[in-house]
Structures are given as C-alpha cells and as structure tokens.
C-alpha cells in the first residue's frame, strides 16, 4: 500500500510538472505571438508614416522658362533673358531670385477654362506671406487674364523703385485695410494669351506697401466693373513676383487661392 502511494505521488508530481511546462510553453508562445504582432504593427505604423512623409514632394528648382503643376497649383517661370531661379515648394509656396534680366516673372496660381465669369466661380481671395527684397523695378501682385473681353489685370501690394503703372486714373477702392488706386492702360499689338494683339490692362495699386495679408480679388473686380472696366470669362488668377531690368529675390513662405468661399 505504501509503495502504491509513493508511486501515485511520483506520478502526480510528474503530471503537474508536465502541465506546468506545457502552460509555460503556451504562455511563452502567446507572449512571442503578441510581441511579433506588436512589432509588426510598429513596423506597419513606421511604414505608413514614411509613406505619408514621401507624399510631400521635394522642392524643385528651375532656372529657365517652364510651366507646369506643383503643390496643387499651376506655376510658371518666364524671362526674356538673364539669370533666374525658382524653387517650387509645397502648396502655393515658392522662392525666386533674378539678376541682369530684361523682364522676368515667377508665379503660382489657378488656371480656368475661359467659360465662367468671376461671379459664376464664386468669391476669389488670396492669402499670402512673403519676404520680398527687390532691387530696382519690380512688383508683388495678384495677376491674371480674362477673355471676351481680353483683359490683363494686376492687384499690386508692393513694389521696388517704381510704383506702377502710370495709366489713366479711374478712382480708388478701400479694401483689406488699405486704399488702392485704380488705373486702366491700353497695350497695342503686344503679347497676350491670344498672341500679339491689342488689349486692356486693369490695375489696383496699394498706396502703402505690404508683403503679407489677404487680397480680396473679387472685390477689386466688382470695383473695376462699377467704373466701366468690364471683365470677361476667367482664364487665370495667380500670385506673381515680377522684375523689369532689375535684380532681387523673394521667399513666398505661404500662399493659397480660395475660390467660392
């Protein structure tokens, strides 16, 4: 009887030890699977973060005439001759510099399809912040075209050595915390979006310079029309840095064009 009891006790101990080993092995396996799962999630999370980072395009620098799309905006660098450089950044941001030029412009904006008026598109405004350093004749502005009638337009917030444009005065508009003088000029047989032809230029020129803020584009349009300066179907609205027989540089830290808001 004693021998059987000893044997039973030994067997029970072996069984319990075996169960403990099995349980520990299962626990270790569970921990391993959990660790692997956690590690896999961390790797996937890292991959997603890396992928999201890569969706932001690296800055692109161009030095000669080029048009294209970058950061959700149409862009253009144009010059007749001289040294130019434009670095395209995320969104509406860009930087530029120029020297020994005849005429050069750097811009980002929105192109339309010449089928709607500004009223049909909805309210248009531009928000921007720029470090602008011109040396000579230059201006910082909203720029664009309409068709039918063909009109080239400028809303100038800052300039270099010369305050444009020296045309026919059409009055003023007070908007966005400042007074703008309104002018109209005529260009005869000059380059345009429709080739060399004759067309009107409309200008709003701020009396006091600034290099950041909001430009309520549609309010300028309405003021022009109230003064007998009709606009046609929208072709383009852009934020523009332009130089003429000058040098300079500009860093457009941020720029956005809001339509229908």
Swiss-Prot record:
Residues 61-255 form the GH11 domain. GO terms for biological process: xylan catabolic process. Keywords: Carbohydrate metabolism, Glycosidase, Hydrolase, Polysaccharide degradation, Signal, Xylan degradation. The active site is at residues 152, 242. Residues 1-28 form the signal peptide. Pathway: Glycan degradation; xylan degradation. InterPro entries: ConA-like_dom_sf (IPR013320), GH11/12 (IPR013319), GH11_AS_1 (IPR018208), GH11_AS_2 (IPR033119), GH11_dom (IPR033123), Glyco_hydro_11 (IPR001137). GO terms for molecular function: endo-1,4-beta-xylanase activity. It catalyses: Endohydrolysis of (1->4)-beta-D-xylosidic linkages in xylans. It is an enzyme of class 3 (hydrolase). Its EC number is 3.2.1.8. Transmembrane segments: none annotated. Pfam families: Glyco_hydro_11. Belongs to the glycosyl hydrolase 11 (cellulase G) family. This is Endo-1,4-beta-xylanase. The lineage of its organism: Bacteria, Bacillati, Bacillota, Clostridia, Eubacteriales. The gene is xynB.
């Amino acid at each position: 009887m004693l021998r059987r009891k000893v044997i039973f006790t030994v067997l029970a101990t072996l069984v319990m030890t075996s169960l403990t080993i099995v349980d520990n092995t299962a626990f270790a396996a569970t921990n391993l699977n959990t660790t692997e799962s956690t590690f896999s999630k961390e790797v996937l999370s890292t991959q997603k973060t890396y992928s999201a980072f890569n969706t932001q395009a690296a800055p692109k620098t161009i030095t000669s005439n080029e048009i294209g799309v970058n950061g959700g905006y149409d862009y253009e660098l144009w010059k007749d001759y001289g040294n130019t450089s434009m670095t395209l950044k995320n969104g509406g941001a860009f930087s530029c510099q120029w020297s020994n030029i005849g005429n050069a412009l750097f811009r980002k904006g929105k192109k339309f399809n010449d089928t709607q008026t500004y009223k049909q598109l909805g309210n248009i405004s531009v928000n921007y912040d720029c470090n602008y350093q011109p040396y000579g004749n230059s201006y910082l502005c909203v720029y664009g075209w309409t068709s039918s009638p063909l009109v080239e337009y400028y809303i100038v917030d800052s300039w270099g050595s010369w305050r444009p444009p020296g045309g026919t005065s059409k009055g003023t508009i007070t908007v966005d915390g400042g007074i703008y003088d309104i002018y109209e000029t005529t260009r005869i047989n000059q380059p345009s979006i429709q080739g060399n032809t004759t067309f009107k230029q409309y200008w709003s020129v701020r009396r006091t310079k600034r290099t950041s803020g909001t430009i309520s584009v549609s309010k300028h349009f309405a003021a022009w029309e109230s003064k007998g300066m009709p606009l046609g179907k929208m072709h383009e609205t852009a934020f523009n840095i332009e130089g003429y027989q000058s040098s300079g540089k500009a860093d457009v830290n941020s720029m956005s064009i809001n339509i229908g808001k």
